[in-house]
């Protein structure tokens, strides 16, 4: 039976595989996928007596670098901290400007404010969740120190286009610090919170941008409960070990030795090079990540199966689904974004509420930054970002995770058909 046929069977209440599929289910939006392997790894950390930053964190960094085909990873307690430390490592601060997308979560933009710089928001391209590459070039000034593109839903941005756009205005680039002088254009610091394991044009996420941050929050594909990391491509002239040491200093008060280094006999002496921050990852978090990373290829494969099942089952509804896979790219399959074509915000909101009544938790990704109080207070007006508003107005995110069975996905598909038909019959537009 085809996916569409299965969805129709669900809607009619027929039995499939001996189970009544029209019985109301509870489909959570994005629960963590925790197996015995994660429990054992965390228990091992607890038994070891070493629970803060230590050997498991360092191993996790090495394993992430191997997985992503990069030279180095630096782990933090969040992707937000990773982004902030990346900006600080470039010397970005007051008086500087950093461009990012208007269509993202606040964590892409708040680090710009944290370092004292000014966020410059860019609209997305028409009908796209990606930053408008042509508009980026027009926003670059002599104050621009970095661009933060966002890999929404795990789909990597077109970094070739972004680089070309920045190279077209390289005459405005004014490097000030030794690290900035390694670039002949504005550096790209990617928000890859969603895109660990994604590939585009033959490059893994982490290799396409100059710097890439990742999130391991509880709802991400790979979780450490809370956590994040930063990696970077091999940049001619960049001393990766020096950069790593600087990032570690930033993450631990500027202290020259972490707790693990101080355990060596006679190694108690330390210095504080500058007043840094406190955003290090712990071994308990890393232990969870180590087990998750070993399972990650299988988790990515399962996500792809679910995405493709959605694509088949929703093909006859006016849902514009984000494209996760193509001839030269594969996303991490993080979020199932769907735009209900021709629908209003009223219809979208009613759709989410009705799906909730059927036991299916849905969400919206994202409310554009200019609609949020904090960014309104900075002077941003949603009228200046019409494409972001259009993407948001009829977007709904369906459950997508590795705890979903085939029957669960078929149930969601069936309920999408039922709820869409119900609202349309009521005249909701």
What is the role of each PLM region?
Residues 88, 92-192, 199:
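PLP-dependent aminotransferase-like
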């Amino acid at each position: 039976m085809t996916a569409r046929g299965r969805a129709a069977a669900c809607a009619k209440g027929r039995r499939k595989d001996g189970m009544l599929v029209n019985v109301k289910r509870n489909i959570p939006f994005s629960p963590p996928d925790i197996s015995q392997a994660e429990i054992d790894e965390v228990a091992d950390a607890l038994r070891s007596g070493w629970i803060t930053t230590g050997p498991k964190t360092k191993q996790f960094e090495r394993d992430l670098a191997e997985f992503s085909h990069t030279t180095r990873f630096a782990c933090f307690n969040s992707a937000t901290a990773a982004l902030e430390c990346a900006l600080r490592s470039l010397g970005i601060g007051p008086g500087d400007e950093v461009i990012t997308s208007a269509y993202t979560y606040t964590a892409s933009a708040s680090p710009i404010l944290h370092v004292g710089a000014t966020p410059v928001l860019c609209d997305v391209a028409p009908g796209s969740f990606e930053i408008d590459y042509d508009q980026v070039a027009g926003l670059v000034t002599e104050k621009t120190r970095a661009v933060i593109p966002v890999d929404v839903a795990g789909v990597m941005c077109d970094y070739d286009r972004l680089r070309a756009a920045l190279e077209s205005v390289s005459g405005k680039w004014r490097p000030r610090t030794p690290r900035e002088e390694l670039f002949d254009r504005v550096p790209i610091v990617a928000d890859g919170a969603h895109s660990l394991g994604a590939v585009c044009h033959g490059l893994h996420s982490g290799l396409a941008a100059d710097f890439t941050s990742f999130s391991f929050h509880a709802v991400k594909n790979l979780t450490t409960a809370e956590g994040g990391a930063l990696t970077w491509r091999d940049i001619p002239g960049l001393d990766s070990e020096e950069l790593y040491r600087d990032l570690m200093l930033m993450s631990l008060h500027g202290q020259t030795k972490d707790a693990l280094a101080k355990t060596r006999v006679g190694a108690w002496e330390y210095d504080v090079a500058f007043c840094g921050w406190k955003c290090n990852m712990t071994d308990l978090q890393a232990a969870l990540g180590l087990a998750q990373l070993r399972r990650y290829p299988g988790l990515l494969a399962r996500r792809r199966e679910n995405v493709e099942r959605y694509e088949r089952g929703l093909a006859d509804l006016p849902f514009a689904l984000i494209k996760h896979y193509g001839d030269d790219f594969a996303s991490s399959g993080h979020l199932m974004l769907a735009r209900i074509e021709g629908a209003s915000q009223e219809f979208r909101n009613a759709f989410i509420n009705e799906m909730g009544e059927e036991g299916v938790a849905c969400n919206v990704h994202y409310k554009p930054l200019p609609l949020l109080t904090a960014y309104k207070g900075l002077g941003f007006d949603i009228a200046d970002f019409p494409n972001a508003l259009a993407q948001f107005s009829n977007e709904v995110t369906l459950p997508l995770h590795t705890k979903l069975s085939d029957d669960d996905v078929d149930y969601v598909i069936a309920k999408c058909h039922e709820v869409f038909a119900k609202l349309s019959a009521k005249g909701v537009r």
